[in-house]
Amino acid sequence: MQLKKITLCLLAAGLHLIAFSQIEHVEPLNWWTGMKNPALQLLINGKDVGSTTAVINYPSMSIKKCTKGQSNNYLFIDLIIAKNTKPGTFNINFKKEGNTVYTYQYSLLAREKDAALLKGFNPADAIYLLVPDRFANGDYSNDVVHEMREKKIDRNFDGARHGGDIRGIIDHLDYIAGMGYTAIWPTPMLENDMELYSYHGYSITNHYKVDPRFGSLDDYKELAVKAKQKGIKLIFDEVLNHTGSNYWWMNDLPFNNWLNKPDSFIRSNHRRTVNQDKYASAYDKDMMTNGWFDKTMPDMNATNPFLAKYLIQCTIWWIETLQLGGIRQDTYGYSDKTFLTNWSCSIMKEYPSFTMVGEEWSLNPLITSYWQKGKQNQDGYKSCLTTIMDFPLQSALVDALKEKEGADFSKGLAGLYEALANDFVYADPKNMLVFGDNHDMDRLFTQLNKDVDLTKMALAYLLTIRGIPQLFYGTEILMDNTGHHKNDGLIRSDFPGGWKEDSVNAFTGKGVSNDQMEVQTYLKKLLNWRKNNPVIATGSILHFAPFDGIYVYFRYNKEKTIMVVMNKNPVPVKIDVKRFAEILKGKKKAENIITGDPVSIQDNIAVPSKTTAVFSVE
């Protein structure tokens, strides 16, 4: 086929020749043939590139339009990639007054087989959340990168970088898989070229670059491949709402409205209810959506169509590049909600079996449920977001285990029972993300006042109730931040054994306490049991109102019945099973899934003190 020359972007020519030397950025870095959406928009950044004419030569490709940014250093090229376009490399020639001033080679890759069928995490999975800088240091050579603004490692300061990296995660995939996890969620590993607190990853300064202190893009790809080989899905932690204040474009924005409130720092009021509140003032809505999350985190204006396209394509690029098993979206609800619909629906159109979870930190299920796909909202708002983090249930679980049992029908285990009863407000409760803690709140062991038994009770609940369980690294060894409430750096402490100089190694068991070993062993047993019992992922729930510090619920399908008994009492109890006849009728035996002991369920069931007992009913 003869190549057809296509010349576009005949922009207003200047009166003098450009002093044009190079293209600084072309994003996305590459693209693929065979995508469902044939459109691709390239962001081109380089000195005076807006005054050039872009010329390409490639078969089966057309250009819809080109748009110059308000800064003359940006050009946006909209391409249409036909279904029959072949993978390959083509030149983008940038011309001025008939002369080519720069040529950039761009690549169209062939998609991985069945990439469009990528499956996201689901209720059959158990997710291990980890902070890469604090998990394991597998490559000491990248601890300090002199080109970066934060140049030191200091494990004695909880706000500094400690040296964990992608190699450290790869090195311990066997541990993660052996524990029974089937998905990992590392906090962001993209470039965070900030002077301070760059370890956490949420001040991104380049959406298309892995932070070199974590490793390279090849390392990230290796992690994805090796995790998949071990049955572990990789979840990408993304931030659409804001960037870091040292982002490469900050001193020369493509458009004047690329950021919200760009001229002075105004903090978000964090009033997330304005998205649903029919009485909310325009002032409060503006402060919520357009205020900055923090003074080093500029708020991106996703109502700008070029930025919106940029962010959507960025998500797709990472899904396709790493063959991801899911996206976790930070600060969901802070961005423009029309954009959030466009973003979520664009991703799901390209990957219909994918999963994305949004962080909506509200304890009100009426607020959290608003964002989930399938929800019939009064204001007509529609979303394609599959999964929501279940903050209401997290809070109810901790309160239930800490509060005294009594006559108040909304306290203690009764509060947990009623929290689950709120599931009628969710479009798809089985796809809620359930958790006891995460990297932004006090550790579960701390929240439960360092009570080992209550911690085990919480873990058993999370692994047997509806939803997709997410556990935080170190929970298995009772890591805590007691005495340092909401100290983020301490909450995200180093995992013992992740550094070669560590005297304690929780990966091998060297030096761990008896309590730590007990919980680690207990959790490993539960996780691996759950992985092999699909009734927990897909089965129905039947629960009975708590009484006398005891809460009983069942997970069941046609093939199997699981009985869960939460006994919060400080003494063992015997439970009369007659109350549960509607589900236990005709069943006589069960097995304690932790101890393996047989149990008769014809009369009474004995349950130890402060225990969540799980029985497989025969």
Regions found by a protein language model. Give the residues of each.
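Substrate-binding/active-site clefts of carbohydrate-active enzymes
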Residues: D125, F135-I316, T321, L340-E350, ...
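Short, solvent-exposed loop/linker segments at beta-strand-coil boundaries, enriched for Pro/Gly
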Residues: Y58-K65
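Active-site-proximal helices and loops of the catalytic beta/alpha 8
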Residues: A224, H242, C314, E320, ...
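Conserved, mostly hydrophobic/aromatic
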Residues: L130, I176, P186, H207, ...
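Beta-strand/beta-sandwich contexts
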Residues: S21-S51, L108-K113
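Bacterial Sec-dependent N-terminal signal peptides
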Residues: M1-P28
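Extended acidic/polar, glycine-enriched regions
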Residues: Q70-L118
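Carbohydrate-interacting/catalytic domains
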Residues: T100-Y102, L109-A126, A177, I477-E618
